[in-house]
């Protein structure tokens, strides 16, 4: 694939040059909030300076765990996830089986709705008898604080044959002028089985809040033209509303609103909340450096102004060396 990559990069550079840009990165970034490659690299390098020491400290902690085993082995890239999971269990002793009973799907969904009500004054009420494309789909009417309709929200939470996996937000009709939006969240949560309801993992809880953040972006928009409404925004802004909404999921005050044991109704204990919060920052130095290393490599590749003699192996080796990381 080395030659294919070189051709792709070459064609991208040629396209950028034809449109008056010195490199492909500046062409792509021209209509974003970042504006240009210099701003992006400044941000990435600044984040790197904070993330790398944290990742190194995490590596030291993992090495100590390996040393306890007495094998005399040095931590390698392929060891990271195995020993990270061992360390997680040792430090926090919190599993999905401890948290899932508190995360009944309907309670989590209603918790997300309650947060939206507190933040924006909106209400979501379930509608019955509305035609949908599948019996699993539920429909909610979204109203503003004054009772006026903002839009219709569909939820399609469960997997089925022929349905794609993953999670996303879609528009069936975008808001424009006085036309109200029809917005959908699609997910792949486990369906109820017998007397056991759909119980979510912590990751799935954050996914629900995240996708609902996208939905709110589409529902609360007020634009004259649908081409600028909702999620029709610059690429480096589109994830902001969803990321912000996702963070509400693990706020202690919010957790106590919706995280209740599906059998007893017990509110999630403070001890579990504390462990959830501690785990959110666990291994984040490594996770952040991995993301940054990939972004820096991509930026280095697409800020090149001459790729005629591009040697991908040499380029990648230099890029990895620059970030002081092993190739994971």
Regions found by a protein language model. Give the residues of each.
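Conserved small/polar residues in nucleotide/adenosyl-binding loops
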Residues: 323-328
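Short pre-active-site segment immediately N-terminal to the catalytic Zn-binding motif
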Residues: 192-207
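Post-HEXXH active-site segment of zinc metalloproteases
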Residues: 218-243
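A short beta-turn/loop motif at secondary-structure boundaries
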Residues: 130-134, 212, 234
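Substrate/cofactor-recognition hotspot
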Residues: 1
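Active-site recognition of the HExxH zinc-binding catalytic motif
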Residues: 203-218
């Amino acid at each position: 694939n080395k030659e294919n990559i070189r051709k792709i990069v070459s064609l991208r550079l040629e396209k950028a040059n034809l449109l008056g840009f010195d490199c492909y990165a500046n062409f792509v970034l021209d209509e974003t909030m970042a504006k240009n490659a210099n701003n992006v690299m400044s941000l990435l390098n600044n984040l790197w300076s904070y993330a790398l020491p944290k990742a190194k400290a995490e590596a030291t902690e993992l090495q100590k765990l390996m040393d306890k085993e007495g094998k005399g082995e040095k931590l390698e890239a392929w060891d990271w996830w195995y020993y990270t999971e061992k360390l997680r269990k040792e430090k926090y002793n919190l599993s999905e089986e401890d948290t899932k009973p508190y995360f009944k799907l309907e309670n989590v969904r209603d918790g997300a709705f309650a947060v939206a009500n507190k933040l924006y004054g909106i209400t979501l009420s379930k509608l019955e008898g509305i035609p949908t494309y599948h019996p699993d789909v539920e429909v909610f009417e979204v109203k503003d604080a004054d009772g006026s309709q903002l839009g219709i929200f569909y939820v399609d939470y469960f997997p089925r044959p022929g349905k794609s996996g993953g999670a996303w937000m879609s528009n069936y009709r975008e808001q424009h002028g006085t036309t109200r939006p029809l917005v959908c969240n699609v997910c792949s949560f486990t369906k109820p089985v017998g007397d056991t309801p759909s119980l979510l993992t912590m990751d799935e809880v954050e996914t629900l809040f995240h996708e609902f953040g996208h939905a709110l972006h589409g529902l609360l928009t007020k634009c004259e033209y649908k081409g600028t409404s909702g999620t029709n925004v610059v690429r480096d802004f589109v994830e902001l509303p969803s990321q912000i909404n996702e963070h509400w999921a693990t706020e202690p005050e919010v957790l106590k609103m919706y995280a209740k044991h599906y059998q007893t109704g017990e509110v999630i204990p403070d001890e579990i909340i504390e462990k959830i919060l501690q785990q959110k920052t666990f291994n984040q130095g490594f996770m952040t450096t991995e993301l940054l290393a990939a972004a820096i490599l991509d930026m280095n590749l697409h800020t090149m102004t001459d790729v005629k003699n591009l040697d991908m192996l040499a380029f990648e080796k230099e890029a990895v060396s620059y970030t002081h990381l092993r190739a994971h």
